[in-house]
């Protein structure tokens, strides 16, 4: 895994977000690319609604992805420049 993060944050661009239901529990599947990845490898994570900070996320948004033990635990929409 290139640029794996055990604990910390990385900036990324949101490529896709879609709601999913896992055993009746609402979650989000997010697909993103890290800004510092020259190959723009797609990354995916499934997170609960409590892990998404920001009113509405849309493809193309800049986001901050927080990791703990290599797992996405928080996604925050960054202000536009």
Give short role names for the model-derived ranges.
Residues 59-62:
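Loop/turn positions that initiate beta-strands
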